[in-house]
From Swiss-Prot:
Name by which UniProt lists this protein: Uncharacterized protein in pdhA 5'region
Lineage, broadest ranks: Bacteria, Bacillati, Bacillota, Bacilli, Bacillales
Binding-site residues for phosphate, renumbered to this chain: K21, N47
InterPro entries, per the entry: HAD-like_sf, HAD_sf
Keyword Magnesium assigned: yes
Gene3D superfamilies: HAD superfamily/HAD-like
Length: 95
């Protein structure tokens, strides 16, 4: 059985039933004993919504789909403007 997740007008992810980025993160934090509140994720596509909603802090890229921005905790600059670097600075995760 499969799950289909559209993340762009012309692109769809095909995943095993129950599979998602959020599920992968859940399994990893369980294995490592990390608190979900300490987990950060960056995303820009519709396939990132579940992940951004799941983690402690979800960051949408400035170029993200509007639905992605709505579920994120905050929005950083677009990918093309070093958005991840700026987001990490905003979160005070890097100097």
């Amino acid at each position: 059985e499969f799950r289909f997740v559209r993340w762009h007008d012309v692109s769809t992810d095909v995943l095993p039933a129950g599979g998602s980025k959020a599920e992968g993160i859940r399994l990893m934090i369980e294995k490592l004993g990390i608190d979900k509140g300490d987990v950060y994720a960056f995303g820009d596509g519709l396939n990132d919504i579940e992940m951004l909603s799941f983690v402690g802090t979800g960051v949408a890229m400035g170029n993200a789909h509007e639905e992605v921005k709505r579920v994120a905790d905050f929005v950083t600059k677009p990918v093309s403007e070093e958005g991840i670097w700026h987001g990490l600075k905003q979160l005070q995760l890097i100097p």
